[in-house]
Amino acid sequence: DVPDSLDWRQEXLVRK
């Protein structure tokens, strides 16, 4: 489940 925004990648890096 990934949003169309590229923010998910940045958040992933921040969260992980």
Curated annotation (Swiss-Prot):
Signal peptide: none annotated. This is Putative cathepsin-like enzyme. Its EC number is 3.4.22.-. Keywords: Hydrolase, Protease, Thiol protease. The keyword Ubl conjugation does not apply. It comes from Fasciola hepatica. GO terms for biological process: proteolysis. It comes from the Eukaryota.
